[in-house]
């Protein structure tokens, strides 16, 4: 599933081709994704794309005729093509945004769990209304995390994956960050110390920044807009490595379902206090 670094990579990849361009048409081949594709997309002919930015795992295509909210879902990806290429349509190519200068933004989604919605202003849309701070922003601090964790009995892994606390820390990067911080994923959030919060915030920022630089993580479906895979999978420390040796201590990486998600951790480097 594309997480924050993958969405950020997609945003950076498509922006140079689209910002400042006018929309010629939006072709919707599959109107039923996670939610029905907004009918307003058919009225955006002539709209100028002002900016493309990311909020949580949503890509916002801001235009002078309203904003398009795109979520990649479980298996979605965006590619940039030229009308001149005349590339064949894949059965999973559900939406094309075509600009007047001949650029195609093509949305491919085998599992059809993504989102293409219209809003007059994205920031006031219900989907974005109750989100926590961005993890790479100055608002996400150790003091903030410590304060939010008080009286929270939920496992710390679930806690940092809660978008109301902080956005965009998905399963892969939660596992990796907790390993780097030396924190067991089942530790109750309320038991985090101020020092642990400081370390955790630091490594979350480090892990996400590194993943963005390397183009995201390619595990199953994610491909960058230029067709290249992400490379962060090559340096994963615990995620997907059940039964393998820990790179730090040599112990065997374990896996457990926490909050309906597979969680990977080192039992020695991430001890759970008794």
UniProtKB/Swiss-Prot annotation:
It catalyses: Hydrolysis of DNA containing ring-opened 7-methylguanine residues, releasing 2,6-diamino-4-hydroxy-5-(N-methyl)formamidopyrimidine; 2'-deoxyribonucleotide-(2'-deoxyribose 5'-phosphate)-2'-deoxyribonucleotide-DNA = a 3'-end 2'-deoxyribonucleotide-(2,3-dehydro-2,3-deoxyribose 5'-phosphate)-DNA + a 5'-end 5'-phospho-2'-deoxyribonucleoside-DNA + H(+). InterPro entries: DNA_glyclase/AP_lyase_DNA-bd, DNA_glyclase_Znf_dom_DNA_BS, Formamido-pyr_DNA_Glyclase, FPG_cat, MutM-like_N-ter, Ribosomal_uS13-like_H2TH, Znf_DNA_glyclase/AP_lyase, Znf_FPG/IleRS. Binds 1 zinc ion per subunit. Keywords: DNA damage, DNA repair, DNA-binding, Glycosidase, Hydrolase, Lyase, Metal-binding, Multifunctional enzyme, Zinc, Zinc-finger. Its EC number is 3.2.2.23, 4.2.99.18. The keyword GTP-binding does not apply. DNA binds at residues 92, 111, 152. One of its GO terms (biological process) is base-excision repair. Pfam families: Fapy_DNA_glyco, H2TH, zf-FPG_IleRS. Its cofactor is Zn(2+). GO terms for molecular function: 8-oxo-7,8-dihydroguanine DNA N-glycosylase activity; class I DNA-(apurinic or apyrimidinic site) endonuclease activity; damaged DNA binding; zinc ion binding. The keyword Magnesium does not apply. A zinc finger (FPG-type) spans 237-271. PANTHER family: FORMAMIDOPYRIMIDINE-DNA GLYCOSYLASE. Involved in base excision repair of DNA damaged by oxidation or by mutagenic agents. Acts as a DNA glycosylase that recognizes and removes damaged bases. Has a preference for oxidized purines, such as 7,8-dihydro-8-oxoguanine (8-oxoG). Has AP (apurinic/apyrimidinic) lyase activity and introduces nicks in the DNA strand. Cleaves the DNA backbone by beta-delta elimination to generate a single-strand break at the site of the removed base with both 3'- and 5'-phosphates. Belongs to the FPG family. HAMAP family: Fapy_DNA_glycosyl (MF_00103). Monomer. This is Formamidopyrimidine-DNA glycosylase. The gene is mutM.
